A protein has these predicted regions:
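Membrane-embedded catalytic scaffold of the fatty acid hydroxylase/desaturase
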Residues: 6-147
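Feature marks short, highly hydrophobic, charge-poor N-terminal signal-anchor/signal peptide-like helices
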Residues: 1-3
Length: 147
């Protein structure tokens, strides 16, 4: 039971951070590189994902600022170190293949390709990482564009 609470607390933190990077100018600039690059060049998993590096330096900085460092801090504060390992498996092995592939649609359980790519088209929607729960809670979800 504790792991479920920790998981949802962590995904809430990532949701808040992801939503914030669309508002804070310097972070928005870094994050925009991710949106621009993935929309035109995403080829799925690559070896550099194992090192938590993306194809461009701004996109890598964005990943570390919005996900990697907050996950480490969250794990340190809560003492729940499994979150780092869970995140690493997701980010290094699955994220590019699942979140940026329009053919993958496992919604409503995960934020898969169709869900996340709506966010790339309309940055006012679908901020959730791993789960669309927080988008539904805060009414930032967009279901219709993923059909």
């Amino acid at each position: 039971m504790t792991e479920i609470v920790v998981f949802f607390a962590w995904t809430w933190c990532l949701y808040v951070i992801h939503r914030s990077v669309h508002v804070i100018p310097i972070l928005r600039e870094l994050h925009w590189d991710h949106h621009r690059y993935v929309n035109t060049h995403s080829t799925g998993w690559q070896w550099n994902n194992l090192l938590l590096f993306n194809d461009t330096w701004p996109s890598t900085a964005d990943l570390w600022i919005t996900e990697v460092i907050p996950t480490v801090i969250f794990s340190y504060i809560t003492g729940e170190w499994w979150v780092i390992w869970f995140y690493y498996v997701w980010a290094a092995l699955l994220q590019e293949t699942l979140e940026h592939n329009p053919k993958v649609n496992v919604y409503p359980w995960l934020t898969s390709g169709k869900w996340h790519l709506v966010h790339h088209k309309n940055t006012r929607n679908n901020y959730g990482v791993f789960t669309p729960l927080w988008d539904m809670v805060f009414r930032t979800h967009n279901f219709k564009d993923q059909q």
